[in-house]
Regions:
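The beta1-alpha1 cofactor-binding region of Rossmann-like NAD(H)/NADP(H)-dependent oxidoreductases
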Residues: 4-14, 46, 159-160
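A short, exposed helix-loop element centered on a Lys and neighboring polar residues
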Residues: 64-65, 112
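Conserved NAD(P)H cofactor-binding loop of Rossmann-fold oxidoreductase domains
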Residues: 32-37, 184
Length: 190
């Protein structure tokens, strides 16, 4: 376990070095660190902006740069899977999260570009875009409110997200994809 702020290059460097020391290679990265701030756009502060960019973007960039360099040296390809958000593609009225979505949406756009840039080296970039997941983060919303967030009327589990990550990590011919795990919320209004 590494203690540190993933938005700092030094932390990413420690993670990378430990992975290589412990496993001998880096074959897959799951960039799961992220924060989500819900408030009206005009209420975001400079501190909110810095925190969102540091964790959601810099946290992805630093660890991914180091992992890609290692994968290139290994010449065996690899997989980078990031966690974004279904709200990027289908915002929900009453859940103002524009600054969070700017960082997550930027991450999705960057993944597609990286998938193209590193395809010839068989380094794949994909994302899982969860909707509402049954975690303590959503425990105060109430079961009925949460179930209305998807047309299936269900809530994703941590296992649902993990299964999607495993699929994208192992699917050798899949790159540049955003896999929505949101009970159909990304398909639009229902």
């Amino acid at each position: 376990m590494i203690d540190g702020d993933i938005g700092q290059f030094e932390t990413a460097q420690k993670v990378s070095e430990l992975a290589i020391k412990r496993f001998g290679s880096i074959d897959a990265v799951v960039a799961n660190a992220g924060i989500f701030v819900v408030k009206p756009f005009t209420d975001y502060t400079a501190d909110d902006f810095r925190a969102l960019v540091s964790t959601n973007l810099a946290g992805f960039i630093y660890i991914t740069q180091l992992a890609v360099k290692q994968m290139q040296a290994q010449k065996t390809g690899g997989s980078i899977v990031s966690i974004t958000a279904a709200l990027v593609d289908n915002p929900i009225v009453g859940e103002p999260a524009s600054l969070s979505m700017i960082t997550k949406g930027g991450l999705q756009a960057g993944l597609i570009s990286l998938a193209s840039e590193y395809a010839k080296e068989h380094i794949r970039f994909n994302a899982v875009a969860p909707g509402i997941v049954d975690t303590p983060l959503h425990s105060d919303l109430g079961e009925e409110v949460v179930k209305r967030q998807s047309p299936m009327g269900t809530v994703s589990t941590v296992e649902d997200i993990a299964s999607a990550v495993i699929y994208l990590t192992e699917a050798r011919q899949v790159t540049g994809e955003v896999l929505h795990v949101d009970g159909g919320a990304h398909v639009g209004k229902w």
